[in-house]
Amino acid sequence: MVFIDACFRKKTPYTPIWMMRQAGRYLPEYMEVRNKAGDFLTLCKNPKMAAEVTLQPVEILDVDAAILFSDILVIPLEMGMDLRFEKGEGPVFSKPVRTWEDLGSLYEFPEEKLTYVYETIKIVRKKLPKDKALIGFSGAPWTLATYMVEGSGSKTYAAIKKLIYTDPEFMHALMIKITEAVKAYLVKQIESGVNAVQIFDSWASALEKEKFFEFSWDYMVDIAEFLKERYPEIPVILFPKGIAGYLDDIYGKFDVFGVDWGTPIDLAKEKLGNKYVLQGNMEPTRLYSKEATKEGVEKIVEVMGAKEGHIFNLGHGMLPDLPVENAKYLVELVHDLTRR
């Protein structure tokens, strides 16, 4: 698999590409299945439908890897939290976790209830071409904790940051519980057939440097090193969004560092390119224009070179109204410009 070889800096015929949120609303085929499911969570919990939308970008765009269709919040959902998706507001938990009593009420083994995810993986792996990788994923403990404590997305993260400074013992206890759940969940994904895993820390930038390492990165690395010890052949990708100023102190045993679009790729290469394969990082809105897409690809390829050490991706997720034709063009362009 070209994607897996690239994760380990092995020789590849071209730079592989996949896109975060590549299975999504910009694809009419996705919307068809989504409408049939009725709502987002039903789609996530239906292995046949979730497998179908996981496979769509590989069939339509010819990306080098499929990423499991699911949601990061299935972990807190199966810990017993009441989750709903509000139109225009996104995910909402009706009862946030803010006290020791709340923490004690969380079910400790959510991975046992996530059988629909493992079933999806098995279906996809059977149908996916042998040369295409399947990426499993989880939210990072910090990002999951922010949703669980805030109760929804947040602009200030005031509730969780208040706990960091007023009750760090509670926060670490919550982080440990989530971390153990993520480890078990990713082990089950690997055992079900994924070829690589990515851990998404969407809200990493909410923390000042010292607290980022204490409450986010240390836990991500703990998961990565736990997995690498058991499954050295499975690449681990870490994606902390918005931490360009912290790159000097990034450490840990993992394979690929995901670069968001706000971090200059040349800076990431200078700071981390010798230690980790880099993944990223075109600004997603460039895909509204073929000219802007071409310029974005050329800039990144100029820095990273048509050689090992890079996986092409966007620096954030696909937007719902991006033209499918431009996404196809991006994949073709990356393959053509980087052919060895």
Curated annotation (Swiss-Prot):
Principal localization? cytoplasm
Q: Which UniProt keywords apply?
A: Cytoplasm, Decarboxylase, Lyase, Porphyrin biosynthesis
Q: How does it assemble?
A: Homodimer.
- Give the site residues for Transition state stabilizer: D71
CDD domains (alphabetical): URO-D
Q: Provide the reaction this enzyme catalyses.
A: uroporphyrinogen III + 4 H(+) = coproporphyrinogen III + 4 CO2
Q: Which HAMAP family match?
A: URO_D
Q: Name one GO molecular function term.
A: uroporphyrinogen decarboxylase activity
Q: Which GO terms describe its biological process?
A: protoporphyrinogen IX biosynthetic process from glutamate
Q: Name one GO cellular component term.
A: cytosol
**Cellular localisation:** Cytoplasm
Question: What does the record give as the organism's lineage?
Answer: Bacteria, Pseudomonadati, Campylobacterota, Epsilonproteobacteria, Nautiliales
Q: Which sites bind substrate?
A: R21, Q22, A23, G24, R25, D71, Y147, S202, H316
Similarity comment: family membership: Belongs to the uroporphyrinogen decarboxylase family.
SUPFAM superfamilies attached here? UROD/MetE-like
Question: Which pathway, metabolic or otherwise, does it act in?
Answer: Porphyrin-containing compound metabolism; protoporphyrin-IX biosynthesis; coproporphyrinogen-III from 5-aminolevulinate: step 4/4
Instruction: Please give the name of this protein.
Output: Uroporphyrinogen decarboxylase
**UniProt-listed Enzyme Commission number(s):** 4.1.1.37
What this chain does, per the entry, is described as:
Catalyzes the decarboxylation of four acetate groups of uroporphyrinogen-III to yield coproporphyrinogen-III.
* A family per Pfam: URO-D
